[in-house]
Structure formats: C-alpha cells, structure tokens
C-alpha cells in the first residue's frame, strides 16, 4: 500500500484497514443476516418476551376517547390563554391592558395549583367512594389517589383531572370582566382563590360530582350553572360592591383595540368546541352533536345581536357581532348535550336578542357598571340556556326534539321545575 491512495486494482478500503480486519468487517454483517433468517423461521410466540404486553388498566382505556379528550383539554385551556385574555384585553382602556392580561395569566397558574391541592377533591372526591350531596370527600387532597394506572370511565383519571382543571381556570377568569379596571391585583387573587374553593368546587360537585342537583336530574351538560351562572353572579355582586368606575355614565369608555378583541373572540369560538363537545368525555355521536349545536348557536347569536344593533342604531358593530357570538355560546352550553340542531338555532337567536336587551337594561337603566358585560351575557345566557334545555330536551317536539328527559321525569313541566331549581 502506497501513501496517497490504493494501488490500481486494490479495493478502496485497502487504504484504511489491513486485509484481516476487512475480512472480519464483511463477515460480521453476514453472520447477523444469517441469524435473522434463522429467527424468522420460528413463530413469534416462541419468543414471548418479544410480544407487546398489555396491562389490565390499558385494556380499560379507549385510545380514541383519550386522544379526543387530550385535544379538548388543550382547546379549553386555549380559551383562557390566550382567548379570553385577548378578548378582555381589547375591551378595556389602553392603560389597563397589561393588568387584565396579567390577571388572566396569574389566575391560570393559581387555579391550577388550587385544583391540585383541594379543588378536585372537593368537587369529585375519590373513585369508588360514595359522595355526599354537598361536597366530595377529602381523599383526593393533593391528588393523593390519582395515579398513572387510575381511570375515569375509559380515559385516564389524570386526564379527567386536567380537563376539569381547565374549567376551574376559566370560570374565575370570566369574573375579571365584572370588576375590570378597579381592583387591586392582590385583592383579585385572594378573592378568586376563596371563590373557587368555596363556590365553584361545591357547585361543581352538586351538578357533576354526584351531588344533590345532579341527583334531581338537572341537565347541565357543559356548565351553564357550574360555570356561567356562578361566574356571572359573582361578577355582578363584585361590581355592585366596588361601585362604578370613575366617570361611568358621563365619560366614554370605548374599547381600545377591537382587533385584539375579535382575535380573542375567534379563539373562544374554536376553543368552545372542546368545552362543550369535550364534556361528552368520549369521541362519539354525543360529542359530534354537541359540536354542531354549539357552532349553530354561536352563529345565530352573533347574527341576532348584529340585527338588533342594526335596527336600533342603523348599522351593526364589530363589538356587537362578537358579543352576540359569546352570548350564543354561553347559552347553548348547558343544553349542548340535550338538544338538536333546530333547537340550537332557536336558542342562539333567543340568546342574541335577550342578552342584548339585558346589557342595555343593566347599563342604561340600572346604572350598574359591569365593566365587560359578564352578567347580561354569561348570567342571563346561562339562565336562559338552562331553562331552554328543559324544554328542547323533550323527544316530542318534532324537528325541535332533543335527547329526552332526565331519569324519572316524563314532561317538560317536570324537567323545567328541576332546571329552575
């Protein structure tokens, strides 16, 4: 072998290795190939250690439902960050934008921690333990009983915890709109923490955790009572106790950036599919129908509010069209698992009209400074949707028929009585 390359006729690798080593390098791959051919002659069951194992826990888990619920959970969190943050941030005056954004961000972090500490246990208790009518048991403080192997139905329990956590995050964030521009950051954190543990978690248990309202047959598929009514009432009470902003009623307080608001509204619309359709806790027809009726109600609420403004002021506004959308979404929330498409159109149109007049009444007649219209949109919408769920769940309304009454109830009157409770 000469310096600078192989001699003519020599193989190229002769420049880098001696012939004995080269023979070994060629022989090793050949031996591996022969061994693999020998293994393939035997059935795989002869080597059980090569077969994938499946635990009893894994057999109880639906991959399809788990995948959908992972997606829905991300969508609901997306509603708060950045959806609701941008929606609210664009509605306030420019000097308060960062304050509102920070409040929504901080609430996401704080509510997540509180849900881990005690919120989930108060709302849902421990698996396999009979729950009381008012509160869940305390066996899941710090999520002590939640493990990787645990399941809730046919999805991992950890995923159910996370999905419900996103609801606990966005509900206090909705209240921010009631006292925006006039509360100290520290006071907001203390109030929100106490409210989540003392109001949200118990009501969540009453409806979804085996409590007294759920046992009565209340139909609240995705949170008309648990989320919208509770948050709206809290926002209204806070607005009354804090009093109006300086200059309210005499100084114009227009939104500072409607582009930001419209962007946030679009995110809310998309995220709401996870909110409502995810509440089916399965990738099935119930989730698909919930998504369809949610979209129809949002569209009809938006058009109805726009039309009311057009009639009253001679032209529609971009703020009106997005607020009507939110009204339609909030109103269909309790009914999204109970009604069909035709009923969803009626619910959306009703939401746009009724919530529009509720907003005018609260601000212009009652002179209540609910900064970002939380009560007339979410509160009135949540109440309206809860009542209409009791009507349109009936299976005897032709094209407007729904999925039926709750167990033990056989008439619209009986279901309405429960819904009104």
Regions found by a protein language model. Name each.
Residues 5-6, 16, 29-30, 234, ...:
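A ubiquitous, low-specificity "background" feature that marks scattered single residues
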Residues 57-421:
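Glycine- and aromatic-enriched membrane alpha-helices
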Residues 5-6, 52, 324:
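Intrinsically disordered/low-complexity terminal segments and short unstructured peptides
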Residues 2-3, 8, 37, 41:
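Basic polycationic patches enriched in arginine
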Residues 16-17, 22:
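Cysteine-centered motifs
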Residues 22-58:
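N-terminal secretory/membrane targeting signals
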Residues 2, 15-16, 156:
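Short N-terminal alpha-helical targeting/association segments
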Residues 11:
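Cationic, low-complexity basic patches in intrinsically disordered or flexible, solvent-exposed regions
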């Amino acid at each position: 072998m000469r310096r600078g390359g192989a001699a003519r006729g020599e193989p190229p690798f002769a420049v880098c290795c001696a012939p004995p080593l080269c023979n070994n390098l060629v022989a090793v791959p050949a031996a591996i190939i022969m061994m693999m051919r020998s293994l393939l002659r035997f059935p795989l069951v002869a080597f059980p250690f090569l077969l994938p194992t499946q635990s009893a826990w894994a057999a109880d888990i639906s991959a399809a439902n788990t995948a959908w619920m992972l997606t829905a959970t991300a969508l609901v969190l997306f509603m708060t960050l950045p959806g609701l943050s941008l929606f609210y941030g664009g509605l306030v005056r420019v000097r308060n934008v960062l304050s509102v954004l920070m409040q929504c961000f901080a609430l996401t972090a704080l509510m997540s921690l509180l849900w881990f500490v005690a919120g989930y246990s108060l709302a849902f208790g421990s698996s396999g333990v009979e729950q009381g009518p008012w509160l869940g048991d305390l066996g899941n403080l710090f999520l002590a009983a939640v493990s990787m192997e645990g399941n809730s139905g046919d999805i991992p329990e950890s995923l159910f915890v996370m999905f419900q956590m996103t609801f606990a995050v966005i509900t206090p964030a909705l209240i921010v709109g009631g006292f925006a521009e006039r509360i100290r950051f520290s006071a907001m954190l203390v109030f929100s923490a106490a409210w989540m543990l003392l109001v949200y978690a118990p009501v969540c248990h009453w409806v979804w955790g085996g409590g007294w309202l759920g046992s009565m047959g209340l139909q609240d598929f995705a949170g008309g009572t648990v989320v919208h009514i509770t948050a709206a009432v809290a926002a209204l009470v806070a607005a009354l106790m804090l009093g109006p902003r300086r200059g309210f009623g005499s100084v114009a307080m227009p939104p500072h950036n409607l582009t930001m608001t419209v962007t946030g509204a679009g995110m809310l619309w998309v995220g709401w599919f996870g909110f409502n359709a995810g509440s089916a806790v399965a990738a099935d027809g119930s989730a698909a129908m919930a998504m369809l009726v949610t979209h129809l109600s949002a569209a009809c609420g938006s058009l109805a509010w726009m039309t009311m403004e057009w009639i009253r002021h001679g032209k529609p506004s971009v703020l009106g069209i997005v607020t009507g959308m939110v009204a339609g979404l909030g109103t269909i929330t309790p009914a999204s698992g109970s009604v069909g498409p035709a009923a969803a159109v009626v619910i959306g149109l009703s939401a746009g009209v009724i919530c529009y007049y509720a907003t005018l009444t609260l601000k212009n007649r009652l002179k209540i400074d609910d900064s970002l219209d939380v009560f007339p949109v979410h509160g009135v919408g949540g109440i309206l949707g809860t009542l209409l769920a009791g009507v349109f769940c009936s299976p005897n309304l032709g094209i407007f028929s729904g999925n039926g009454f709750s167990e033990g109830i056989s008439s619209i009157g009986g279901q309405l009585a429960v819904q009104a409770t």
